[in-house]
C-alpha cells in the first residue's frame, strides 16, 4: 500500500468521524493496524510520508536517560501536531485555528519541552503557519487540503512509531540505553523481534554506557493557557475545547467540538476555563524521569546560597520523585520510606540515625554526580565503571538538573563530616 492510498484512507477516516460529530485525530483501528504493520516492516515509509521521523526522534530522544517516558512525551507531541493539522483541514472556517501562541499552553508544555524550536517551526510551516513575531504563529495562506492530510498522516505515523519503539524496549527489558543505538537497530530491522535481538547483542558487547549528551536550554514551565486564544479572556465563560463559549453562525454545532481522549484527561491544556492545568495521574507516576526532557532545571529554583533547610527540602522532595524499589532488593528501603520511618520514630521514640551517602572516587573535583545508588549509598558520574556492578540489582536514582545534583553532592560532603570525623559516633 503506497503513501497515496494511505492518505486517501486517512482522509476518509477523518471525514467519517466528522459526520459522527467528532473532529479529532484518527482512531480507526483497522487503519492503525495496517499502518503499524507497514511501519514495522519498512521504516523507510517515513521518508515517503515526508514526516522527518529521523530528525524528530533524534532530537526528541537526545540526552534522555530513560527512553520509555521520553517516547510517551513524543507521542503526546505528535498527537498535538496531528490535531492541529486536522483542525485546519476539517474546520478551515474557524479563525481561532489560524493563530498559535508560542509562549504558553500546549505549545510550551507538550511541544517545546521535547522538540527543538527549529523542528517545531518546520512542522508548523508544513501546515501553512508562519512566524508573525516572537509569540505567534499564524496561517496567512492556507495550504491545499491534500497537504494538510499528508501532514496529519505523517504525525499519525510518528505516533505509531513511538508505540513500536516502546514495544521494542518492553521486549528488551530495559529502556536505559543510548537513543542512537535504538534508532540504528530500528532502521536495520524488519520486525520487532529482530530489532530486540540486535540490541541484545549490541548491549552485551558494551561494558559501560557512554556518557549522556547534554540537553538543550530548558523551557520555561508556567501556567498553561489556550493554544490558540489570547491571554485576555473572560474566565467566567463556559469552558470548551477552544475557549469559545458559544460558536458563531459560521461555526459547526457544539456537538462537533471533539475532545480526543488525550485532552479529556487534561481538558484545560487547550481550553480556557480559567482553571490551572494538572497532569494526569499516570504522569505523576512517571515523575522519576524528566517529564518533558528539557524541563529539568525548572523543577527547582536555584538557591542563592547553600543552607541546610534547602538541602533537607530538596533531598526530601527527591525522595518523592525516586523510582520504586528494585524488586530484586526488597530489603533496601527507599529514601522516602526511610524518611517516613524516621519521622515516626522521632515522634514516639529515639530517632533512627539517617544513612550517610558518599561521593564515589569517579567524581573528580568540580564535577557533579548524575546517578545515586540507594543500595551502596554512593554518588556516581555517568561514565563510572562501578555502575556495571550496581545496575543488575541495585536501586539507581537519576539526579535531575544541576540544582539537585549540587545538593546531593553537598549532602555527601556533610555526611562525610558528620559520620567520618572523630567523635561523630558514641
UniProtKB/Swiss-Prot annotation:
Keywords: Phosphoprotein. Residues 204-223, 234-256, 269-300, 316-347 are annotated as: Disordered. The modification Phosphoserine is found at residues 318, 326. Gene3D superfamilies: 1.20.58.2190. The keyword Phosphoprotein applies. Belongs to the SPATA2 family. This is Spermatogenesis-associated protein 2-like protein. The gene is Spata2l.
Amino acid at each position: 500500500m503506497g503513501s497515496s492510498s494511505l492518505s486517501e484512507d486517512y482522509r476518509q477516516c477523518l471525514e467519517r468521524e466528522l459526520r459522527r460529530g467528532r473532529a479529532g485525530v484518527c482512531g480507526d483501528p483497522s487503519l492503525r493496524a495496517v499502518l503499524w504493520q507497514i511501519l514495522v516492516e519498512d521504516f523507510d515509509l517515513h521518508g515517503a510520508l515526508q514526516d522527518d521521523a529521523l530528525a524528530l526522534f533524534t532530537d526528541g530522544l537526545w540526552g534522555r536517560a530513560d527512553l520509555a517516558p521520553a517516547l510517551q512525551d513524543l507521542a503526546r507531541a505528535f498527537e498535538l501536531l496531528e490535531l492541529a493539522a486536522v483542525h485546519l483541514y476539517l474546520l478551515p472556517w474557524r479563525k481561532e485555528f489560524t493563530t498559535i501562541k508560542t509562549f504558553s499552553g500546549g505549545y510550551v508544555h507538550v511541544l517545546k519541552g521535547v522538540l527543538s524550536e527549529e523542528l517545531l517551526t518546520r512542522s508548523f510551516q508544513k501546515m501553512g503557519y508562519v512566524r508573525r513575531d516572537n509569540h505567534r504563529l499564524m496561517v496567512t495562506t492556507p495550504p491545499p487540503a491534500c497537504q494538510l492530510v499528508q501532514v496529519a498522516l505523517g504525525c499519525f505515523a510518528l505516533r505509531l512509531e513511538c508505540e513500536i519503539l516502546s514495544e521494542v524496549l518492553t521486549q528488551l527489558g530495559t529502556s536505559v540505553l543510548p537513543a542512537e543505538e535504538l534508532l540504528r537497530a530500528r532502521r536495520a530491522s524488519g520486525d520487532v523481534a529482530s530489532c530486540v535481538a540486535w540490541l541484545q547483542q549490541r548491549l552485551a558487547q558494551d561494558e559501560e554506557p557512554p556518557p549522556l549528551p547534554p540537553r538543550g536550554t530548558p523551557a520555561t514551565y508556567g501556567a498553561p493557557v489556550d493554544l490558540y486564544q489570547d491571554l485576555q479572556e473572560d474566565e467566567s465563560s463556559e469552558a470548551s475545547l477552544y475557549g469559545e463559549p458559544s460558536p458563531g453562525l459560521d461555526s459547526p454545532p457544539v456537538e462537533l467540538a471533539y475532545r480526543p481522549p488525550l485532552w479529556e484527561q487534561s481538558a484545560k491544556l487547550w481550553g480556557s476555563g480559567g482553571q490551572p492545568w494538572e497532569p494526569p495521574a499516570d504522569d505523576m507516576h512517571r515523575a522519576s524521569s524528566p517529564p518533558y526532557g528539557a524541563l529539568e532545571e525548572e523543577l527547582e529554583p536555584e538557591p542563592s546560597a547553600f543552607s541546610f533547610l534547602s538541602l533537607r527540602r530538596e533531598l526530601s522532595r527527591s525522595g518523592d520523585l525516586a523510582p520504586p524499589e528494585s524488586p530484586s532488593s526488597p530489603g533496601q528501603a527507599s529514601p522516602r520510606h526511610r524518611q517516613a520511618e524516621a519521622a515516626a520514630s522521632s515522634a514516639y521514640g529515639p530517632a533512627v540515625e539517617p544513612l550517610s551517602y558518599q561521593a564515589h572516587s569517579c567524581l573528580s573535583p568540580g564535577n557533579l554526580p548524575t546517578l545515586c545508588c540507594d543500595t551502596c549509598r554512593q554518588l556516581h558520574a555517568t561514565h563510572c565503571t562501578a555502575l556495571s556492578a550496581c545496575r543488575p540489582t541495585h536501586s539507581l536514582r537519576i539526579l535531575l538538573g544541576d540544582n539537585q545534583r549540587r545538593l546531593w553532592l553537598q549532602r555527601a560532603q556533610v555526611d562525610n563530616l558528620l559520620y567520618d570525623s572523630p567523635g561523630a559516633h558514641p
